[in-house]
A protein has these predicted regions:
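Inter-lobe coupling/hinge segments of SF2-like helicase ATPases
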Residues: 1-164, 177
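Long, hydrophobic alpha-helical segments
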Residues: 165-170
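Short, intrinsically disordered, charge-balanced linker/junction segments flanking boundaries
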Residues: 171-177
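Conserved small/polar residues in nucleotide/adenosyl-binding loops
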Residues: 181-185
């Protein structure tokens, strides 16, 4: 089997901006400020929490922080028609914030959603985090990604490397750099 050539698209689509990626601790003030900023400019927010057993508690916290927001919850243990209705409702703008598991990782295109919070980011692989971050920044608005982690010095070294790589390589077309980091591990 021969090696194949690799093609890299190095030019971003017109009017697209890099996703501003930040590593943050679990902090309600950061959540409130980031969500309010996005909602004030007419956008929507993803909040990823990959634990179904307490996802509704997280949704309750977000609803308490932003009482006027229309909050929805989506996860893979929901009945198919209920999940589909929730996701379509978010895509159509019926909800401001979607609290979800990684079910949104692939195939969900919501150009109006330009902020994503990823809770316990240290528990995900590099490609998962890159895919989730890619759910935002699909329009001509600046997008924001918040990787929520414990203090970095409390994380395993491989988790630290993953999170720092995502923060460092956030420009459009950065996927190839992340692949090279992933291969070298």
């Amino acid at each position: 089997m021969a090696a194949r050539d690799l093609s890299v698209i190095a030019t971003a689509p017109p009017n697209r901006y890099p996703i501003e990626s930040d590593i943050v601790r679990f902090n309600e003030n950061i959540f409130r400020d980031g969500i309010q900023y996005e909602l004030q400019r007419g956008g929507q927010v993803f909040f990823i929490h990959n634990r179904v057993e307490n996802i509704h508690e997280v949704a309750g916290m977000i609803q308490r922080l932003i009482p006027d927001a229309r909050v929805a919850v989506g996860h893979g243990q929901m009945k198919g028609n209920k999940l589909e209705k929730t996701l379509l409702g978010f895509m159509e703008g019926q909800y401001d914030i979607l609290i979800a598991t990684t079910i949104i990782e692939n195939g969900l295109d919501v150009p109006n959603a330009n902020t994503i919070f990823i809770n316990n980011a240290q528990n995900f692989g590099l490609s998962d985090l890159h895919q989730m971050r890619g759910r935002v920044g699909r329009s001509n608005k600046k997008a924001f990604c918040y990787f929520i982690t414990p203090p970095l010095n409390a994380l395993a070294s491989d988790a630290q490397k993953r999170i720092k790589a995502l923060e460092q390589f956030s420009e459009l077309g950065a996927g190839i750099h992340l692949v090279l980091i992933h291969i070298s591990e």
